[in-house]
């Protein structure tokens, strides 16, 4: 183990403050550190405080990881109240973050080049903060982007921005979309933020900002697998330097450390899982952002009761700033369930999905959850809501063959009833279809293990990235 000095290749990661962004970015950081680099992970002070409380992170203190170090440095988003509701108003918050972030991140990077410190060799950003590329350009530093969704979704945003493919419009809202090297996507299977009537259009504009600055990114690192999306990766590699480096959570160097990006402490549920028979438990989680209507939660609960399956259900309390109430379960639900089910506020998801008692995963189909299920060999029941989730669900069911579709997203505008929930859960856990789904899931698990093994496609791409940054920093 060496020491931190001016000769370390220094990678500075700037991450949008959200759980689904922090996890893959931190995994990338741990891998780079393990390979002998100095890595600084930066996001807003608001989220930094949550990471300190949940994981014992210490600011500015280089923590050894493998042959290198990782350190944390946070910047103030200028909103002193941790429960300020304006953080959930992205029309307000995304521009604010750019305004304050540009100045503060620039200052942080300049500081590292002074007084004999390790000057920054490369900046890495992720969606919603494309201004990091501007900072890199102004400082004459290479910039890479960590794309935390699938390559298929990347292709959709790229072609929408370039206007090379027709997408739904106000005049033709139900237009299907044919992207190069992908199956036909129905109008409700494209990333919903690109739909003209989507209520979260600000998110689409925020993501598209990355594509308007695509030429400023030397690399597009993707948390996907070359062999998972071969045709699309090849197609997109013709227009930008796409490097699949996933699944980041499976890379050994990114897992052999206690440093985690969780914003709240996970509940203990592994002993309970170990008390259940193999392939018997349904895991239910809708991620850190999705908030279902109370009546939908009721229908899921009744469907679980009717199915009789054992389940582990993550019911995360909403942030105060979100202005919504905590879900409640139907009267008598917990008494009827008994030890057949367990509710937690947060879980160690990777360990849960890897547990032998898991039968399937009822998921919102965020890309982190999708890739974790795929590469841990777990079949899924898809319950997407918006954004890339609807596209991921299409691929999980129709392309990868590991899932059953329970709904199509909020655009479907309907309540999924308890009978549908019961039928889908039973089909995914018992019988011929369940066997087929598991067979396909195990196939993708093997693909993922080969990709992250030494000499695998993702390891090669990561090595290439490190070598290029090292050459650039020497020059």
Swiss-Prot record:
CDD domains xref list: GT1_Gtf-like (cd03784)
Enzyme Commission code: 2.4.1.-
This protein's UniProt keywords: Glycosyltransferase, Transferase
Molecular-function GO terms, alphabetical: quercetin 3-O-glucosyltransferase activity; quercetin 7-O-glucosyltransferase activity
Pfam families for this protein: UDPGT (PF00201)
PROSITE patterns: UDPGT
Keyword Ribonucleoprotein among record annotations: no
Keyword Glycosyltransferase: yes
Family of this protein: Belongs to the UDP-glycosyltransferase family.
Protein name: Putative UDP-glucose glucosyltransferase
Organism this protein belongs to: Fragaria ananassa (Strawberry)
Organism placement in taxonomy: Eukaryota, Viridiplantae, Streptophyta, Embryophyta, Tracheophyta
């Amino acid at each position: 183990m060496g020491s931190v000095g001016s000769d370390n290749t220094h990678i500075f990661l700037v991450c949008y403050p959200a759980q689904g962004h922090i996890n893959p970015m931190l995994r990338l950081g741990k891998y780079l550190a393990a390979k002998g680099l100095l890595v600084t992970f930066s996001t807003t002070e608001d989220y930094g405080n949550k990471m300190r409380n949940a994981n014992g992170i210490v600011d500015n203190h280089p923590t050894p990881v493998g042959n290198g170090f990782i350190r944390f440095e946070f910047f103030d988003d200028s909103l002193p109240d941790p429960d300020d509701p304006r953080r959930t108003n992205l029309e307000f918050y995304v521009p604010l973050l750019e305004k304050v972030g540009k100045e503060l991140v620039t200052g942080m990077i300049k500081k590292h080049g002074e007084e004999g410190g390790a000057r920054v060799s490369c900046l890495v950003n992720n969606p919603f903060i494309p201004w990091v590329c501007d900072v890199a350009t102004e400082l004459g530093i290479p910039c890479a982007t960590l794309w935390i969704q699938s390559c298929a979704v990347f292709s959709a945003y790229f072609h929408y921005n370039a206007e090379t493919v027709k997408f739904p419009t106000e005049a033709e809202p139900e237009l299907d979309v044919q992207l190069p090297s992908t199956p036909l996507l129905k109008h409700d299977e494209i990333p919903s933020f690109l739909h003209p009537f989507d209520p979260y259009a600000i998110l689409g504009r925020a993501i598209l900002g990355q594509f308007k600055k695509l030429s400023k990114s030397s690399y597009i690192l993707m948390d996907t697998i070359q062999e998972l999306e071969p045709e699309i990766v090849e197609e997109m590699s013709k227009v930008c330097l796409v490097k699949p480096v996933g699944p980041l959570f499976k890379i050994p160097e990114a897992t052999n450390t206690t440093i985690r990006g969780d914003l709240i402490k996970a509940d203990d549920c592994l002993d309970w899982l170990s008390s259940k028979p193999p392939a018997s438990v349904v895991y239910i989680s809708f991620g850190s952002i999705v908030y279902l209507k109370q009546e939908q939660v009721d229908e899921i609960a009744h469907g679980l009761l009717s199915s009789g399956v054992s389940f582990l259900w993550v019911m995360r309390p909403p942030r105060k700033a979100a202005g919504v109430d905590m879900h409640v379960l139907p009267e008598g639900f917990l008494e009827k369930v008994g030890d057949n089910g367990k509710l937690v506020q947060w879980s160690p998801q990777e360990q849960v999905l890897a547990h032998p008692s898991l039968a399937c995963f009822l998921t919102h189909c965020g890309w982190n959850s999708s890739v974790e299920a795929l590469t841990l060999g777990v079949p899924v029941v898809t319950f997407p809501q918006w954004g890339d989730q609807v596209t991921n669900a299409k691929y999980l069911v129709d392309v990868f063959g590991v899932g059953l579709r329970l709904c199509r997203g909020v655009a479907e505008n309907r309540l999924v009833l308890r009978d549908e929930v019961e039928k889908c859960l039973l089909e995914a856990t018992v019988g011929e279809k369940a066997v087929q789904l598991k067979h396909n899931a195990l196939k993708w698990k093997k693909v993922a293990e080969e990709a992250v093994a030494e000499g695998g496609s993702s390891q090669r791409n990561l090595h290439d990235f490190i070598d290029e940054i090292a050459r650039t920093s020497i020059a």
